[in-house]
Amino acid sequence: MSAIVDITSREILDSRGNPTVEVEVELSSGARGRAAVPSGASTGAHEAVELRDGDKSRYGGKGVLKACSHVENDILEVLQGAESEDQIAIDNAMIDLDGTPNKSRLGANAILGVSLAVAKATAEELELPLYRYVGGAYAHLLPVPMMNIVNGGEHADNPIDIQEFMIQPVGAPTVADAIRMGSEIFARLKKGLSEAGYNTNVGDEGGFAPNLKSADEALGFIAKSVEAAGYKLGEDVTFALDCAATEFYADGRYNLKGEGKEFDASGMISYLEDLANRYPIVSIEDGLAEDDWEGWAELTTRLGKKLQLVGDDLFVTNPERLRRGIKAGTGNALLVKVNQIGTLTETLEAVETAHKAGYACVMSHRSGETEDSVIADLAVATNCGQIKTGSLSRSDRTAKYNQLIRIEQQLGSAARYAGRSILKNS
């Protein structure tokens, strides 16, 4: 085993041009690991805290020099000499050093950067791919991509209230074929939107962000694109939504301003149910607001047997909030975002907790991403079976798809694509 000898950090840019933290860890063996930390736009109120400088003269106050300083001073002082393979002890040492329930003193962006860089350095020393080091010998399941090809909500400057409209190539035989199918559908969608007179600018996650008026219109364009690409709806390709409902929830009401509609929780559930009855939607993320526990209970009762109901803002990859949801029978799937909780150890604990309770897991990017493809490895390491990493454009998104293709090739005959096994009624 090797000890940590040095930790360095720097301010780099994410995919939105905002600063974020990058960390490098060096071991006594000479092995090194580097990790860049993503950032979200529609963030849950219960997420671990991302430390920003607040200095308006730099990056409009979004600088992360304080977080970088914590890495190179406070955290290095505690971790220098620690054995890199003891990931749990390393992560717990940083949690204890921070001393807050939400990592607000050192910053989850500082802590996560170190946590992931340590894992990468150790994997390099052991001459193992990261997915194998973290997941062990049974890490061989390639996830179904949830490809966000139409962006709305906080991810785009258009009237669409729902944040993400995704396709899932469940009928593909391999992840490489799934990515190819997604690319072909994406190209058809661009052609269809352009011919209808809509712009084909892309949003934060690489999906198109046209000025469509409703979710129904967006789903209609996607359905036509799937068929134009030669695939069968519901058989080759299914749909998924991320409503990010907290963003349009206030005073007990869900206000879809773009569509001119307003609902209570029951009405919002009926709205989603109608869409799911008319399109091959198999998964809905954050269909209701993060603290509308009563509404979520009704949502799960009404739709949970036939649809995957994913908690993102609801659970924020936090094992404690997840356990509350499991106990209450709320939702049936966890969205996994490493920066919501802030360490690799806690992320793996959340996935294990979800799997033990029979909840599905979806590994996820953030809207502010980097070229770091770590979530592709973690999706395979944890046997999640599903991954959200944006559309088929922008290299910050395609970097993850390209890494999945590499992993599948490395695994050879041992590789398995999750495919239709992720469906509730498969």
Swiss-Prot record:
Under the heading SUPFAM superfamilies, the entry gives: Enolase C-terminal domain-like (SSF51604), Enolase N-terminal domain-like (SSF54826)
Which UniProt keyword terms apply here? Answer: Cytoplasm, Glycolysis, Lyase, Magnesium, Metal-binding, Secreted
The pathway it acts in is: Carbohydrate degradation; glycolysis; pyruvate from D-glyceraldehyde 3-phosphate: step 4/5
* Entry's Gene Ontology cellular component terms: cell surface; extracellular region; phosphopyruvate hydratase complex
Q: Which InterPro entries match?
A: Enolase (IPR000941), Enolase-like_C_sf (IPR036849), Enolase-like_N (IPR029017), Enolase_C (IPR020810), Enolase_CS (IPR020809), Enolase_N (IPR020811)
Q: Give EC number(s), comma-separated.
A: 4.2.1.11
The record's annotation in PROSITE patterns points to: ENOLASE
Task: Please list the residues that bind (2R)-2-phosphoglycerate.
Answer: Q163, K337, R366, S367, K388
Per the record, a Pfam family? Enolase_N
Question: Bound how, and how many: what does the cofactor note say?
Answer: Binds a second Mg(2+) ion via substrate during catalysis.
Read off the CDD domains from this record.
Answer: enolase (cd03313)
Binding-site residues, Mg(2+): D242, E285, D312
Q: Which Gene Ontology BP annotations are present?
A: glycolytic process
Swiss-Prot/TrEMBL catalytic activity:
(2R)-2-phosphoglycerate = phosphoenolpyruvate + H2O
SMART domains of this UniProt entry? Enolase_C, Enolase_N
Q: Where is the active site?
A: E205 (proton donor), K337 (proton acceptor)
Grouped into one coarse class, the protein's main location is: cytoplasm
Q: What compartments host this protein?
A: Cytoplasm; Secreted; Cell surface
Q: Which GO terms describe its molecular function?
A: magnesium ion binding; phosphopyruvate hydratase activity
Q: Which family does it belong to?
A: Belongs to the enolase family.
Q: Which HAMAP family match?
A: Enolase (MF_00318)
Q: What does the record give as the function of this protein?
A: Catalyzes the reversible conversion of 2-phosphoglycerate (2-PG) into phosphoenolpyruvate (PEP). It is essential for the degradation of carbohydrates via glycolysis.
Please give the name of this protein.
Enolase
Q: Which organism is it from?
A: Gluconobacter oxydans (strain 621H) (Gluconobacter suboxydans)
